[in-house]
């Protein structure tokens, strides 16, 4: 930075929240999003109607009407299913390929996994969950294969593989002759919807830690706040320079958890493709609202509100109370289960 260089405002890129329903729904990473894309498109309007026998009392009524023909709906849904169904299958196979399997007794190319094997993996995960105490990180020069075989990651690998194989079995049982029929069959049952959810999450896990970030803007410093400096900082956070710097900063970054799950070094794709943000208040954001920058004849860079998040309250415990809870859990579990080790929290 230059000496006496003007500082208009401060911003940073932070890790995206893992579970954010309104964002995932907007991207298409939820079962509800798939159901909407498969459904007939409708338009809802509201009007007031007089209720008979009430001396002119009016009630607000919702009217729904189709905005596409049955033929248009069939064509659109078919195209969507032909794209989505193979993608769901691909997500499952790619997730399985990222798990170290040598000590799990599973062959990677098994097309039709058996329920007996899934039950074995579930039992293995439960067994190693009991052994996952006093975990330690080898942060200096980790041997990824040895790390994968640790009690903590053997438990994680067995549990993840069991879930993925169970999902694969559900997809194998679908008998439809077209992708449209197969996807509709999955959406029709709770088991099928659960399988879709697992396949979507498998994709989200790979994207959320590397291709997506949250914008954190602290606002502008006087006198630039009077010149809407905060909005300028928000716009510049999406600039080619920021995206390029992010890509180069993380292009050789080793994914700690993914490497331990696979038993070898994993470097995720670092191309930044999604920037989002959340706000403390739901009423609006003076920092981001009304931002719109023309890019070309048919496109704009603009802030788009996609929904309202749901949050939970927080509680505060004193250091003394926290220490006593920690000692109590150690006595109960026979050791420390939370040791600030990669993988314990996810």
Predicted regions and their residues:
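Extended, composition-driven regions rather than compact fold-specific motifs
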Residues: 1-346
């Amino acid at each position: 930075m230059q000496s006496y260089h003007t500082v208009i405002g401060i911003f940073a890129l932070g890790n995206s929240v893992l579970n954010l329903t309104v964002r995932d729904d907007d991207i298409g990473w939820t079962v509800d999003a798939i159901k909407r894309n498969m459904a007939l498109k409708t338009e809802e309007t509201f009007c007031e109607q007089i209720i008979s026998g009430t001396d002119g009392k009016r009630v607000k009524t919702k009217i729904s009407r189709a905005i596409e023909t049955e033929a248009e709906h069939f064509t659109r849904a078919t195209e969507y299913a032909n794209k989505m169904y193979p993608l769901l299958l691909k997500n499952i196979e790619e997730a399985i390929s990222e798990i170290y399997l040598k000590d799990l007794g599973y062959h990677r190319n098994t097309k039709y996994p058996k329920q007996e094997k899934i039950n074995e993996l579930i039992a293995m995960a439960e067994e190693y969950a009991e052994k996952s105490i006093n975990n330690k990180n080898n942060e200096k020069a980790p041997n990824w294969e040895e790390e994968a075989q640790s009690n903590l990651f053997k438990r994680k690998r067995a549990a993840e593989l069991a879930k993925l194989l169970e999902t694969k079995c559900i997809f194998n049982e679908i008998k439809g002759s077209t992708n449209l029929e197969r996807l509709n069959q999955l959406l029709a049952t709770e088991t099928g919807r659960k399988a879709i959810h697992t396949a979507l999450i498998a994709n989200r896990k790979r994207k959320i830690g590397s291709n997506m970030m949250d914008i954190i803007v602290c606002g502008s410093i006087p006198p630039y706040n009077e010149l809407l400096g905060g909005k300028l900082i928000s716009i510049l956070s999406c600039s080619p320079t920021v995206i390029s710097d992010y890509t180069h900063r993380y292009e050789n970054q080793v994914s700690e958890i993914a490497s331990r799950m696979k038993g070898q070094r994993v470097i995720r794709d670092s191309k930044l493709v999604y920037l989002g943000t959340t706000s403390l208040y739901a009423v609006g954001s003076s920092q981001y609202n009304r931002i719109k920058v023309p890019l070309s004849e048919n496109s704009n860079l603009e802030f788009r509100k996609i929904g309202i998040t749901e949050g939970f309250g927080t509680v505060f415990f004193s250091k003394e109370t926290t220490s006593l809870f920690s000692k109590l859990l150690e006595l109960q579990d026979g050791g420390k289960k939370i040791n600030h080790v990669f993988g314990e929290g996810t």
